[in-house]
Design a protein with these regions (language model features):
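A loop-to-helix transmembrane entry motif
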Residues: 23, 129-136, 157-167
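Membrane-interface interhelical loops and short amphipathic "cap" helices
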Residues: 8-28, 70-91, 145-161
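Core alpha-helical transmembrane segments of integral membrane proteins
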Residues: 1-59, 64, 68, 72-75
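Interfacial and helix-entry/exit segments of alpha-helical transmembrane bundles
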Residues: 53-58, 117-140, 184
Length: 184
């Protein structure tokens, strides 16, 4: 029910604003929380621990969105931010970050389980399964962000902190992907 309510309000924000609501930090955090809720709803039947964990992660994301200095108002964007490349770039990056957050939570749970080895193995396998789409979305998101930056600013890469840390994250998780055995 929370997922349905959240996505309904997100779609209303899209309708009222007349644009995809990914143009500022507040809207990006709303998308991240919504995707975490969606993942939780999809996988909670198979992994019962995911319901409280996903709701907690989504709730913290919404808390950050509403208690921070980010502007929650629906405002018109600068023309450079109205590009469909930007919406695709931001949504892919946020999807990857949501999957990484779920992986982190599952890894912490797997490390805390002492008695049941089968649960630990199941959590580890779930993390490995999440790793593939997370790295793929992050890589494609970085590439599309570079294309958007070139179209908008005239340069593919500017070495600002967001770009650098996204690249570092991609490289670290890419190494993990390269060294981990494939899921069966």
């Amino acid at each position: 029910m929370a997922c349905l309510f959240h996505w309904t309000s997100y779609l209303l924000r899209w309708y009222i604003g007349g644009r995809i609501p990914l143009g500022n930090g507040h809207e990006t955090m709303l998308f991240l929380a919504g995707f975490l809720l969606l993942c939780t709803c999809i996988w909670q039947r198979r992994f019962s621990f995911l319901l409280p964990a996903g709701l907690l992660l989504s709730g913290f994301t919404l808390l950050v969105a509403y208690l921070s200095e980010m502007n929650p108002q629906i405002t018109p964007l600068m023309p450079v931010l109205l590009s469909p490349w930007l919406s695709l770039h931001v949504s892919l990056i946020m999807v990857s970050y949501a999957l990484f957050a779920l992986m982190c939570l599952c890894s912490i749970l797997a490390l805390s389980i002492r008695r049941h080895a089968w649960q630990r193995q199941r959590l580890t396998l779930f993390c490995r399964v999440l790793l593939y789409p997370a790295v793929l979305c992050l890589g494609i998101g970085i590439f599309i962000g570079a294309v958007w930056a070139n179209v908008s600013w005239g340069s593919y890469w500017a070495w600002d902190p967001k770009e650098v840390w996204a690249l570092i994250t991609f490289m670290l998780y890419g190494c993990l992907l390269y060294t981990s055995p494939s899921p069966r």
